[in-house]
């Protein structure tokens, strides 16, 4: 059994760790609230934009979307990996990296490159894939305008023929304890035809419907990427809060076990001292 000093040192060490994980949990909880409010507020906008685009497209004659919907033979694929800049968030990053590897296997025989958003994904995937661009600072100033520049970059890679297909892979936020890895096709767009929504009315358009659709497509792509990053951002803080909560609970349990061990060792030491004193006294009396 370890001596009393060693046990005391371990108790001090575990207590310090518990204070750190508890503080990180509270910080993540505060950040999660803001991130959750942001993604909750923008989802209806993104859904309405998609609905508007589909309703307009469904009332047009012929194929809509132009170069954005061009289906080419898939030879070169770009996977956009959205991860975090920091760790200590459970399986948050590893799940995305695992899905990147699954998609790479799915496209076996084709050129598969990565576009990394987040330092953790870039650090790991740069060892196994060709990384075309990485954006680590985006989370420091997460605004629609900053994400729009990245979306324009990705769109240009498709329109120029540099890549035949682009997919987004990220954690979708469900709640603090649950994040779902999503793979979404970014480009080419699926053919823009659908049933007209019951809420779609008969309107006079200025400019034409075609012009409006071609204006909405780039905005829709920017919104899709922004929503994906916002989802990932909220998921990161939820995963970190959950991980730190579990770490704090484990540290508390370990500290309690160490205290029990310490008390038993201290009690045994006192008992031995008493026995030695009694034994010495009996020897003197004898």
Swiss-Prot record:
A Gene Ontology biological process term: proton motive force-driven plasma membrane ATP synthesis
Species name: Flavobacterium johnsoniae (strain ATCC 17061 / DSM 2064 / JCM 8514 / BCRC 14874 / CCUG 350202 / NBRC 14942 / NCIMB 11054 / UW101)
GO MF annotations, alphabetized: ATP binding; proton-transporting ATP synthase activity, rotational mechanism
CDD domains: F1-ATPase_gamma
InterPro entries: ATP_synth_F1_ATPase_gsu, ATP_synth_F1_gsu, ATP_synth_F1_gsu_CS
Keywords, comma-separated and alphabetical: ATP synthesis, Cell inner membrane, Cell membrane, CF(1), Hydrogen ion transport, Ion transport, Membrane, Transport
Name by which UniProt lists this protein: ATP synthase gamma chain
Family, per entry: Belongs to the ATPase gamma chain family.
GO CC annotations, alphabetized: plasma membrane; proton-transporting ATP synthase complex
């Amino acid at each position: 059994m370890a001596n009393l000093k060693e046990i005391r040192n371990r108790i001090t060490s575990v207590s310090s760790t518990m204070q750190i994980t508890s503080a990180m949990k509270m910080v993540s909880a505060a950040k999660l609230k803001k991130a959750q409010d942001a993604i909750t507020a923008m989802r209806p906008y993104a859904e309405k934009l998609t609905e508007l685009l589909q309703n307009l497209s469904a009332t047009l004659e012929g194929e809509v979307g132009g170069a954005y919907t061009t289906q080419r033979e898939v030879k070169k694929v770009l996977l956009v990996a959205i991860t975090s800049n920091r760790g200590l968030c459970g399986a948050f990053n590893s799940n995305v990296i695992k899905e990147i590897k699954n998609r790479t296997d799915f496209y076996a025989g084709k050129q598969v490159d990565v576009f990394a958003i987040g330092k953790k994904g870039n650090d790991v995937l740069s060892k196994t894939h060709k990384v075309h661009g990485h954006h680590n600072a985006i989370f420091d100033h997460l605004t629609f305008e900053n994400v729009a520049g990245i979306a324009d970059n990705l769109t240009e890679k498709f329109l120029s023929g540099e890549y035949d297909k682009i997919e987004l892979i990220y954690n979708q936020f469900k709640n603090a304890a649950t994040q779902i890895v999503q793979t979404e096709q970014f480009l080419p767009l699926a053919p823009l035809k659908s049933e007209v929504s019951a809420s779609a009315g008969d309107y006079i358009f200025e400019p034409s419907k075609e012009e409006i659709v071609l204006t909405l497509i780039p905005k829709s792509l920017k919104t899709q990427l922004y929503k994906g990053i916002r989802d990932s951002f909220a998921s990161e803080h939820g995963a970190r809060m959950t991980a730190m909560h579990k770490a704090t609970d484990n540290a508390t349990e370990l500290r309690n076990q160490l205290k029990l061990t310490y008390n038993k060792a201290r009690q045994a030491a006192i008992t031995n001292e008493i026995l030695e004193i009694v034994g010495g006294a009996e020897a003197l009396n004898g």
